[in-house]
Every structure is written in C-alpha cells, then in structure tokens.
C-alpha cells in the first residue's frame, strides 16, 4: 500500500482544500492528513476559527482522507514519515523547496495551489461585509 501524508491547518475548509486532498490521494492508496493543533497555531501566531477537534471532525468526513493526526510542531515530520510508513510527502507549491530535506526518506511532491481561493481571502472578504 502506497501511503501519502500532507499537513495544514485546514480552517474554513473550501474547495481549494478539497482539490488538494483529492490530488494528494491520487498519489497513493492511503492519505494521512496532519492538522495543526490549537497549541501549535498559537506558537505560529496563527488564529484558526475552528478548534482542532472540529477541524479534525470535518476532515474525517472527507472521502479522500483515511486518517487525521495532530501536527504539534515543525520538527515532527521526519518521525511521522517513519511512524506511518509514508511513501509520498505532499504540500502546496507555496512551500516549494522547504521540505526537500525529506527526500532521503520519501518522495516529496509540491502541488499547485488552486487559483482564486484561500482561507485568507475568505477571511478578508467576510471582514469586508
């Protein structure tokens, strides 16, 4: 079985997230999604609208997602690859090159972002109403 992993906050889930998850799943048989915990978001000074538990619940209902795990810190990725027997590490191309150090453990793929949609854009548009 070919296993794929991706990481993100996945707050205010939108069709760009769904397209990323769909394309990530197409790279293997089993997709693990690591989502930032509330504590990790605080460390990153990133505010999420939904709590970790609510984001996890939402992601677990998506047909492309086989497993959801917590992302607690930047450093855990190497261990996650080992612990979950990962073959492919996937991120959006806004992270291009940042995870190349993982190439000795698995294939690293940067997928193009979906044009015209982002959580930041949604938040800005809602704030402008």
Swiss-Prot record:
Q: What is the effect of changing residue 11 to A/E?
A: 0.1% of wild-type activity
A single GO molecular-function term is: glycerol-3-phosphate cytidylyltransferase activity
Q: Subcellular location, in the record's words?
A: Cytoplasm
Q: Note the CDD domains from the entry.
A: G3P_Cytidylyltransferase
Q: Which UniProt keywords apply?
A: Cell wall biogenesis/degradation, Cytoplasm, Nucleotidyltransferase, Teichoic acid biosynthesis, Transferase
Induction field: Positively regulated by WalR. Mainly expressed during exponential growth and rapidly shut off as cells enter the stationary phase.
Temperature section of the record = Optimum temperature is 50 degrees Celsius.
Gene Ontology, cellular component aspect? cytoplasm
**Keyword Oxidoreductase on this protein?**
no
Task: Tell me what happens on changing residue 38 to A.
Answer: 8% of wild-type activity, but 7-fold decrease in substrate affinity
> What reaction does this enzyme carry out catalytically?
sn-glycerol 3-phosphate + CTP + H(+) = CDP-glycerol + diphosphate
According to the UniProt record, what happens if one changes residue 74 to A? 50% of wild-type activity, but 9-fold decrease in substrate affinity
Tell me the superkingdom of the source: Bacteria
Metabolic or biological pathway? Cell wall biogenesis; poly(glucopyranosyl N-acetylgalactosamine 1-phosphate) teichoic acid biosynthesis; Cell wall biogenesis; poly(glycerol phosphate) teichoic acid biosynthesis
E.C. numbers: 2.7.7.39
**What is reported on the regulation of this protein's activity?**
Inhibited by the divalent cations cadmium, mercury, tin, copper and zinc.
Binding, CTP:
9-10, 14-17, 46, 113-120
Residue positions binding substrate: 44, 77
Q: What Pfam family is a match, any one?
A: CTP_transf_like
Kindly state a single biological-process term from the GO annotations of this entry. Answer: teichoic acid biosynthetic process
**Function noted in UniProt:** Catalyzes the transfer of the cytidylyl group of CTP to sn-glycerol 3-phosphate so the activated glycerol 3-phosphate can be used for teichoic acid synthesis, via incorporation into both the linkage unit and the teichoic acid polymer by TagB and TagF.
Any miscellaneous information on file?
A: Proceeds via a random order reaction mechanism where there is negative cooperativity in the binding of substrates but not in catalysis.
Q: What family name appears in the similarity comment?
A: Belongs to the cytidylyltransferase family.
| Subunit and interaction comment | Homodimer.
The entry's protein name is Glycerol-3-phosphate cytidylyltransferase
Q: Give the organism the record lists.
A: Bacillus subtilis (strain 168)
């Amino acid at each position: 079985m070919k296993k794929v992993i991706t990481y993100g906050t996945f707050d205010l889930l939108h069709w760009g997230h769904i397209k990323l998850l769909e394309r990530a799943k197409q790279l293997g048989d089993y997709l693990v999604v690591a989502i930032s915990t509330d504590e990790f978001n605080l460390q990153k000074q990133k505010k999420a609208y939904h709590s970790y538990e609510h984001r996890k619940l939402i992601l677990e209902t998506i047909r492309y997602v086989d497993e959801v795990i917590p992302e607690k810190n930047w450093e855990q990725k190497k261990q996650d690859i080992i612990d979950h027997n990962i073959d492919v590490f996937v991120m959006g191309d806004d992270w291009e090159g940042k995870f190349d150090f993982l190439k000795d453990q698995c294939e690293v793929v940067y997928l193009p972002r979906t044009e015209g949609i982002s959580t930041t854009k949604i938040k800005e548009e809602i704030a402008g109403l």
